[in-house]
Amino acid sequence: MSDRPPLPPFDRESALTKVQAAEDAWNTRDPERVAGAYTVDSAWRNRDAFFTGRPAIIEFLTAKWNRELDYALRKNLWAFGGNRIAVRFQYESHDGRGQWWRSYGNELWEFDEHGLMRRREASINDVAIAESERRIFGPRPAGERGIEFPLQ
């Protein structure tokens, strides 16, 4: 198995790098690419859904991005220690009827010794927004990396 740096234990710089890498991958909306950052038996809780393994992750993300159109995400480091990282995030997307949503969430991540995520727990709340209220347009520009995203 090849390593996926940075590897635990995390310091502030390596945790920030891991968070930005996750944001970048999720903004591709490529389920296969995203799933590659997780162990083959990674355990997930996403809202009220529980599942395990890369095939289930790919299935979940495929359905998610078929439903959450023009998805764009921002993640910020919240805390880290040892092989764990906590993040807060916001993403925006619209549904098939054209209603825009901003989703606020927190994630708890646990990594194996190779830098692959073996556990992900996500709690998420959705808020309907007007298209004119959007703040997230595609992947984060290079000049905005490392900048804390505002709560509101």
Segments from the language model and where they lie:
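A solvent-exposed, acidic/Ser-Thr-rich amphipathic alpha-helical stretch
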Residues: 14-16, 31-85
